[in-house]
């Protein structure tokens, strides 16, 4: 199973969104045995992402990680996830594409 898209959330905003926080979303998806491909592959912690997926108003100084690919653990061990480079994509959108390649 794969759930991918713009979730408009990150654990950095959990306190602002009590009752429907990002951590609760990750927990709920975990109950369906789904994990973040990005965090699994890169070994990063939710809320401490190095690579942003959004540049608010296309401003490089206002970057956040709010787009995710949640996948089953089996898929997470055999996939590749790339996030588009701002130099290539920022003129098209404030969100960078998530490119999930599956090994079948």
Residue map of PLM features:
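Low-complexity, intrinsically disordered Gly/Pro/Thr-rich segments
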Residues: 76-89
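Surface polyanion/phosphate-binding segment centered on an Asp-His-Pro turn
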Residues: 91-104
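A short pocket-lining beta-strand/turn micro-motif at the edge of beta-sheets
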Residues: 62-66, 77, 96
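Short proline/glycine-enriched turn/loop segments at secondary-structure junctions
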Residues: 56-59, 87-91
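Metal-dependent phosphoesterases centered on the DNase I-like endonuclease/exonuclease/phosphatase
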Residues: 1-66
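Short loop segments at secondary-structure junctions
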Residues: 73-76, 102-104
């Amino acid at each position: 199973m794969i759930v991918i898209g713009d979730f408009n959330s990150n654990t950095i905003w959990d306190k602002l969104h009590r009752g429907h926080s990002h951590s609760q979303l990750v927990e709920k998806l975990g109950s369906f045995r789904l994990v973040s491909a990005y965090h699994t592959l890169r070994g990063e912690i939710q809320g401490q992402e190095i690579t942003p997926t959004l540049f608010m108003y296309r401003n490089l100084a206002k970057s956040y990680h709010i787009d995710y690919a949640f996948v089953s653990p089996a898929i997470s061990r055999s996939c590749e996830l790339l996030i588009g480079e701002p130099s290539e994509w920022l003129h098209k959108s404030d969100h960078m594409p998530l490119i999930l390649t599956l090994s079948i």
